[in-house]
């Protein structure tokens, strides 16, 4: 890669940028602590980011995720507080794949329009737009109120009598209620109920997720029967594959320039091999960046999975940290890049892991 094509990505946690409240309180609400807005990325602000040498800006937390903020007046179903991490919620517990986080909008009913305007401002500033695509898991109370007509809800046609079915969108623990090993009530009057329990996002296939699990999320089913030797059921194409492809095409149609694919290695490489070329057929310049932490899978996701880039967290980042802390000598840096075996130009280096 020559310098003209070199990517320099500026990551920003969108809800923090522009929030000038210097007196935030622990566990405070959006009213008490405030929240950054998409409108805070003015032409001036974006111009300053461009001056840093950035080519792309990765807006973290754009897609609507679970939150304890009540938006029922805007016809957004509330989330039970027991399954939301923090008041604002995790940006990786997606609640509606087809919508924008209302916290980020100055005018909530116009949140999608505000995002489209943000993309336009970013492009006018000479920067390209990357957003997260979170394919492995969703919020426990996922419900899309913005999905296009003719689109079915995730899980709406699932047969919950089966722990695994290649036709289901989720994995289930049949005839079992969720018994989370965490506060199942939170600030609510009644505890959270889930029957039958669904498998938790970090591949926990029982009804007892604990506080260290991704307990606020549920695992999506791409046709892999993990509890029976990881057998794959990819013919016919699983319904989840089709739904995820449609979601990527929806956001690609908003003129974004790339997806940073969260925990891409927890989704079978066969899905990416099938989906990415179909997206690129319509949007050939769209970038796909994968979060993969197993070096043994790097080439698989690059060459078979068709990703453009991976980011080198367990290689260079961890090595630099070890050298800085005195656990390794500087020669470890050379060993790190040599271990990539010729794919270093497709690895993104970072100084901080994402929030």
Where do the language-model regions lie?
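Active-site-proximal helices and loops of the catalytic beta/alpha 8
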Residues: 137, 149-150, 159-180, 243-351
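Short, well-ordered alpha-helical packing segments
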Residues: 46, 98, 115-123, 131, ...
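Aromatic- and acidic-residue-enriched segments that line the glycan-binding/catalytic groove
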Residues: 65-90, 136-212, 303-310
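Short, acidic/polar
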Residues: 35-49, 235-252
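N-terminal structural segment of carbohydrate-active enzymes
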Residues: 1-128, 136-138, 143-147, 159
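Structural preference for beta-strand elements that scaffold enzyme active sites
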Residues: 7-11, 56, 126-130, 258-260, ...
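Conserved small/polar residues in nucleotide/adenosyl-binding loops
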Residues: 353-355
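N-terminal small/glycine-rich loop or linker at the start of catalytic domains
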Residues: 3-30, 204-233
């Amino acid at each position: 890669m020559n310098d003209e094509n070199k990517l320099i990505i500026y990551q920003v946690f969108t809800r923090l940028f522009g929030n000038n409240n210097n007196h935030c309180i622990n566990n405070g609400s959006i009213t008490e602590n405030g929240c950054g807005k998409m409108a805070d990325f003015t032409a001036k602000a974006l111009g300053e980011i461009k001056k840093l040498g950035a080519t792309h800006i990765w807006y973290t937390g754009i897609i609507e995720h679970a939150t304890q903020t009540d938006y029922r007046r805007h016809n957004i179903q509330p989330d039970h507080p027991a399954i939301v991490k923090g008041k604002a919620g995790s940006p990786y517990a997606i609640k509606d794949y087809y919508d924008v986080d209302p916290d980020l909008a100055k005018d909530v009913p116009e949140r999608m329009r505000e995002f489209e305007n943000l993309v336009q401002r970013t492009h006018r500033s000479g920067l390209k737009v990357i957003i997260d695509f979170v394919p492995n898991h969703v919020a426990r109370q996922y419900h899309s109120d913005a999905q296009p007509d003719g689109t079915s809800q995730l899980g709406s046609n699932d047969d919950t009598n089966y722990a695994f079915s290649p036709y289901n969108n989720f994995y289930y623990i049949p005839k079992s209620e969720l018994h989370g090993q965490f506060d199942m009530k939170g600030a609510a009057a009644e505890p959270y109920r889930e029957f039958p329990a669904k498998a938790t996002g970090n591949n926990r296939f029982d009804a007892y997720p604990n506080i260290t699990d991704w307990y606020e999320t549920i695992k999506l089913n791409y046709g892999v029967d993990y509890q029976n030797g990881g057998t794959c059921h990819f013919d016919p194409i699983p319904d989840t594959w089709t739904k995820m492809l449609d979601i990527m095409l929806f956001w690609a149609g908003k003129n974004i320039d790339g997806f940073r694919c969260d925990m891409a290695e927890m989704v079978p490489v066969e899905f990416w091999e099938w989906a990415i070329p179909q997206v690129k057929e319509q949007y050939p310049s769209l970038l796909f960046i994968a979060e993969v932490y197993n070096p043994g899978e790097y080439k698989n996701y690059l060459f078979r999975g068709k990703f453009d880039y991976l980011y080198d967290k367990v290689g260079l980042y961890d090595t630099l940290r070890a050298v800085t802390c005195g656990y390794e000598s500087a020669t470890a840096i050379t060993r790190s890049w040599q271990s990539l075996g010729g794919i270093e130009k497709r690895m993104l280096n970072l100084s901080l892991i994402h929030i």
